[in-house]
Design a protein with these regions (language model features):
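Cys/His-rich short segments
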Residues: 154-207
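Structured secondary-structure scaffolds
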Residues: 39-87, 139-143, 193-336
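A charged helix-plus-loop insertion that forms the helical arch/lid used to bind
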Residues: 99-112
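Short hydrophobic targeting helices and cationic amphipathic motifs
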Residues: 18, 29-31
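Short, charge-patterned binding micro-sites
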Residues: 89-95
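A broadly conserved sequence feature marking short terminus-proximal activation segments
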Residues: 110-166
């Protein structure tokens, strides 16, 4: 047996061989053409991390999340699942525009540098992702513009005027009642008044449907404490319509029919989970999308649970797409 193993290693380069070991003997025999019948019936498993925001170098929390997701992806492969693991970088928004200005370079140069560093670290840690998406990818940007137009055409997005409070680090809007001690309830930083023309999404139209879905799908938001937080703090008190465009900065995906507006960063970022696997809102989605969606698991930090369990499922409902099977909000891992 020992000699046979050496012969295998000599025929297959070592990195590939050890990956085959991890995935199990079945993949090795698949390469020899002896398990193609089983391949046809392997259940799919689509797992994603939140895409890392490129306002600076990755922090320990980003690394914690990618390692968790990688462990799950590897385990599912060993169980025989046909796994697709997607991660990537979120590259638009006011915060990035300001950071690039401070650095004396263009926003695109800034995000190129940060995204390259993030990918280098993920590769250094040998994470087994299948797709690394960037929200500056041309195909993603084009699809976001089409999604925005579709939602506008069907009456889910309307033009109005925004006046309220904005947290630049979180790229989030808040009402006075949502603040904690007058500061952002998510990060604790000061908020600033914002007043500008904007497009809004009719969150209120879909809120009752989402509440019913959460109540009838207890596995959708995990752990349960996160579900209770979303229901009690946001959904049950009454969901306000969401501002989905900005005019006070330019680093974003332009609204195709009104280019002085750029798409709100969360409508842009959240759609990566479908654009990355070939979604097309014109009805020409790829075979990969039809195979993989809905996602089996969105693994995210607890600080962005609201975006993934309220805004994202409502966007999907408006697009007439099924919701991900589970969103898991993990705790933070902090330095110091």
């Amino acid at each position: 047996m020992r000699q046979g193993r050496k012969e295998v290693v000599s025929r297959v380069n070592k990195p590939v061989f050890f990956r085959l070991q991890e995935s199990g003997i079945r993949q090795f025999f698949y390469l020899k053409g002896e398990m193609k019948a089983m391949e046809k019936i392997r259940p799919k498993y689509y797992i994603t991390t939140a895409i890392a925001y490129t306002s600076g170098k990755p922090h320990i929390g980003n690394t914690y999340e990618i390692v968790l997701a990688d462990s799950i992806a590897r385990f599912k492969r060993q169980q025989g699942y046909d796994v697709f693991f997607q991660t990537g970088t979120d590259e638009h928004g006011q915060k990035i525009e300001l950071k690039a200005e401070e650095a004396g370079i263009t926003p695109k140069e800034f995000v190129d540098n940060v995204s390259t560093e993030i990918k280098r670290i993920w590769d250094l840690m040998n994470t087994s992702y299948d797709k690394f998406i960037r929200t500056t990818d041309a195909d993603h940007e084009a699809q976001v513009q089409k999604i925005f137009k579709k939602l506008y055409d069907q009456g889910d997005i309307y033009k109005g005027y925004y006046e309220g409070l904005y947290c630049t680090p979180c790229e989030s809007f808040f009402t006075e009642s949502q603040l904690v001690d007058g500061k952002c309830p998510d990060c604790g930083r000061p908020v600033t008044p914002a007043k500008e023309e904007a497009y809004f999404f009719k969150m209120s139209k879909y809120a009752p449907r989402l509440i019913d879905y959460i109540n009838t799908h207890p596995e959708f938001i995990q752990p349960v404490s996160r579900k209770n937080e979303m229901m009690n703090n946001f959904l049950l008190p009454g969901l306000q319509d969401l501002c989905v465009s900005r005019t006070s900065f330019t680093w974003g995906i332009p609204v195709s029919f009104d280019p002085k507006h750029v798409t709100y960063v969360w409508l842009d970022a959240l759609t990566n989970y479908i654009t990355g696997i070939g979604y097309d809102c014109d009805g020409n989605s790829s075979e990969q999308f039809n195979k993989l969606w809905p996602a089996d698991l969105h693994l995210i930090g607890k600080d962005i649970i609201r975006f993934h369990t309220i805004y994202w499922p409502i966007f999907l409902m408006a697009l007439d797409l099924p919701l991900p099977k589970q969103v898991f909000g993990h705790p933070w891992l902090l330095q110091g």
